[in-house]
Swiss-Prot record:
One of its GO terms (biological process) is methylation. It comes from the Bacteria. Its EC number is 2.1.1.-. NCBIfam families: prmA (TIGR00406). This is Ribosomal protein L11 methyltransferase. The lineage of its organism: Bacteria, Bacillati, Bacillota, Bacilli, Lactobacillales. The keyword Cytoplasm applies. Methylates ribosomal protein L11.
Length: 300
């Protein structure tokens, strides 16, 4: 079988958004390259490739893909070169591409994300595995913003908390939280395809029994407070999310934010402050920032 490979040349900041556009256009697999895995790319230059099966007539889809990539700039996102290129690839190349780019990745000392088709075994008894189907959209769990999110979860969770995962995507953060002892998890995503992908990934990970996954726009209409709210999303979505958080965060609870490129950190901090939240700690990975925040108290 032949596949059509569509590659968008971009920068790190836009990688997740472009992956979503390509998935929504009918891609069956996404491959992300940046300087950490491809020597020919330097700095924050990145490439997102999507593989479409023969049954999809890709040239028909290209104008909309191009238009949606360009529209990202309207949300304040830098897209870099933004060029879109087509290539036919044979099945064998595709199989090799998966193997090359989706390797088990140790996110933290205790959590490793593993493509579902590998037989990777933990190297020690404390290493827990997050099994993900790499054919599904919304990240394989190896993006730096996901790394930061999992690191922040590991820093604040002690077990037994209630957690809300906003923009769950592949469900990776909910699976990580379940491994860290959280049983009461609500996972939401505005996109039904993402919710379906998350549910399928929950089924691959026995630890996730009982997670509620539903389509929802941010936290509109959600009731019932949580100890931890985690959101790895673009700043353009985090800004309207933040004012919804204080009503849903228990006293002493944490809001964990990732998906923030360094240039957008100031606007996120301003929005947090205007809504009675303060930054307890910030984590950095490349150009990305993760913020551990909590409600301000009288002592602050
Ligand atoms: C960068 S992905 C994060 C996926 C996953 N949580 C992770 O950390 O790898 C962002 C997700 O947010 C979702 N999203 C975007 N806007 C949203 C909204 N208004 N409400 C809920 N989810 C949203 C997207 O569909 C996407 O799945």
């Amino acid at each position: 079988m032949e596949w059509t490979k569509v590659t968008v040349a971009t920068v790190n900041e836009a990688v997740e958004a472009i992956a979503n556009i390509l998935t929504e256009a009918g891609a069956e697999g996404i491959q992300i390259e940046d300087a950490s895995i491809n020597d020919t790319l330097v700095g924050d230059v990145a490439a997102v490739s999507a593989f479409f099966p023969e049954t999809v007539f890709v040239p028909e889809k290209l104008p909309l893909i191009r238009q949606r990539v360009l529209q990202l700039t309207e949300f304040g996102l830098s897209i870099g070169e933004g060029s879109v290129n087509l290539q036919q690839v044979a099945d064998d190349d595709w199989a090799t591409a998966w193997k090359k780019y989706y390797q088990p990745t140790r996110l933290t000392r205790f959590l490793t994300v593993v493509p579902s088709w590998t037989d990777y075994q933990p190297t020690d008894e404390r290493e827990a595995l997050i099994r993900m189907d790499p054919g599904m959209a919304f990240g394989t769990g190896t993006h730096p913003t996901t790394h930061l999110s999992v690191q922040m979860l590991e820093m604040v969770l002690r077990g037994g908390e209630q957690l809300i995962d906003v923009g769950t995507g592949s469900g990776v953060l909910s699976i990580a939280a379940a491994h860290l002892g959280v049983q009461d998890i609500r996972a939401y995503d505005v996109d039904q395809v993402a919710v379906d992908a998350a549910v399928a990934n929950f089924d691959l990970n026995p630890v996730t029994q009982g997670i509620i996954a539903k389509p929802n726009d941010l936290l509109h209409g959600i009731t019932g407070a949580a100890d931890v709210i985690v959101a790895n999303m673009l700043p353009v979505v985090l800004v309207p999310l933040i004012p919804q958080v204080p009503a849903l965060l228990k006293e002493g609870g944490h809001l964990l934010l990732a998906g923030i490129i360094t240039e957008k950190e100031a606007v996120i901090r301003e929005t947090l402050s205007a809504n009675g939240l303060m930054v307890e700690e910030s984590l950095h990975m490349g150009d990305w920032v993760g913020l551990i925040t909590r409600l301000k108290t009288d002592e602050d």
